[in-house]
């Protein structure tokens, strides 16, 4: 009994040793097989990490580039808006200045025109006043020195004025016809001369002789009055008045027996 138990224990120990040795061999074999697999997996993980890093870097660079591009676009838009605003301000100010300058020029022109018209009106008034004073003076002289009545003197002055107007119209008509005749006669020539043989004077000489720019003072010829026996009387205005007798009165004053 004792020997059998020892054999069994020895056999079990040998079996356990064999199992352990087999397990060690199997473990060594499996470890040898797993090492290249682990190395290949480590290399693949390194490659994936590098690819991921590259992709992340690319994405980050693209993001930064897009962000920079957006900032540049926004800056360009901002600059364009600022420039457009400044241009609009400049154009508006320029237009306002132009409008104000145009208004000032219109006011200056209107003022000049008003001053010219006022000067002409004042000149005409002065001329009319001078003419009226001259006529009144002539009327006073004729009334004081002549034997005609006031109505006769006024009628004579009116006739003279009408005669001067008719004379001016006739001269203007003659000048216009002279110009037309000479223009049709010398049509197509570079230089032409007004016919002095037919008219005597040229239209320019006639116009200068007429002197339309001067104030026309009517000249009246006072007939010589025979001195009377009565002494001359001095008026309060220091105007010497002459008394003359009419021819009818002189004839009636003579007596039928005289002579």
Swiss-Prot record:
Record-level Gene Ontology MF annotations: calmodulin binding
Protein name (record): Protein IQ-DOMAIN 10
IQ domain mapped to chain residues: 50-77
Gene: IQD10
One Pfam family matching this protein: IQ
Protein species of origin: Arabidopsis thaliana (Mouse-ear cress)
Region described as Disordered: 18-39, 226-259
Physiological role: May be involved in cooperative interactions with calmodulins or calmodulin-like proteins. Recruits calmodulin proteins to microtubules, thus being a potential scaffold in cellular signaling and trafficking. May associate with nucleic acids and regulate gene expression at the transcriptional or post-transcriptional level.
Subcellular locations according to the entry: Nucleus; Cytoplasm, Cytoskeleton
Family: Belongs to the IQD family.
Subunit: Binds to multiple calmodulin (CaM) in the presence of Ca(2+) and CaM-like proteins.
């Amino acid at each position: 009994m004792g020997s059998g138990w020892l054999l069994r224990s020895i056999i079990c120990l040998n079996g356990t040793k064999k199992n352990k040795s087999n397990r060690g061999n199997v473990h060594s074999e499996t470890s040898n097989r797993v090492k290249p697999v682990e190395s290949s997996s480590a290399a693949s993980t390194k490659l994936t990490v590098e690819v991921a890093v590259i992709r992340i870097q690319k994405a980050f660079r693209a993001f930064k580039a897009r962000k920079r591009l957006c900032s540049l676009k926004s800056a360009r838009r901002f600059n364009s808006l600022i420039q457009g605003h400044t241009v609009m301000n400049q154009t508006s100010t320029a237009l306002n200045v132009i409008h104000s300058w145009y208004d000032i020029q219109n006011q200056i022109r209107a003022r000049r025109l008003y001053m010219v018209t006022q000067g002409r009106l004042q000149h005409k008034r002065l001329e009319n006043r001078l003419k009226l004073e001259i006529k009144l003076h002539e009327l006073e002289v004729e009334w004081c020195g002549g034997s005609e009545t006031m109505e006769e003197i006024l009628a004579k002055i009116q006739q003279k004025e009408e005669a001067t107007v008719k004379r001016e119209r006739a001269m203007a008509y003659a000048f216009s016809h002279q110009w037309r005749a000479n223009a049709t006669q010398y049509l197509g020539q570079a230089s032409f001369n007004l016919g002095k043989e037919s008219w005597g004077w040229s239209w320019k000489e006639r116009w200068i002789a007429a002197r339309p720019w001067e104030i026309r003072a009517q000249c009246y010829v006072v007939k010589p009055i025979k001195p009377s026996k009565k002494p001359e009387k001095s008026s309060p205005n220091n105007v010497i008045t002459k008394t003359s007798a009419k021819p009818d009165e002189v004839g009636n004053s003579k007596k039928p027996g005289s002579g």
